[in-house]
Amino acid sequence: MKVKTILVSQPEPSNEKSPYSRLEEKYKLNINFRPFIHVEGMNAKEVRQQKIDFNNFQNIILTSRNAVDHFFRLCKEMRFAVPDSTKYFCQSEAVAFYLQKYVVYRKRKIYVGEKKIEDLEAVFKKFNKETFLFPTSDMLKPDVPDFLNKSTLNWQRAILYKTV
């Protein structure tokens, strides 16, 4: 039995020098690209309906690159200038490095965990009197909210994007 068609669950590569194009030519295959998960940002009106005012939060908890993108996109859309004093708590180093796209990277205001949100527990205890914003998708595993509740932090979840 010979394979004629391959389904790849990611967006189609923009350049022609991708390994997929070489596979197509070499083995005369038909490769279909269909992303199974699509992330759609919410607009400012939908965020305001959640009664979220970005001015009320000194700290932002970021768990993914999507959260970073949509938080800063909505800040721009709502004409909110993020203060320099804002502290960012990133679940992993990858998210922290991605944050450089929007913020000047200074060690004193970006706190990084190793892989899990629990890695930041000691840092959260230092700032337990301040308010935290937690930008998320509409679908969220209960692990992080359970941990934040257990840590007795003053935090609020903001649904900034939807997984379709």
Q: Where would I find each of the regions flagged by the language model?
A:
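Conserved beta-alpha
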Residues: M1-V164
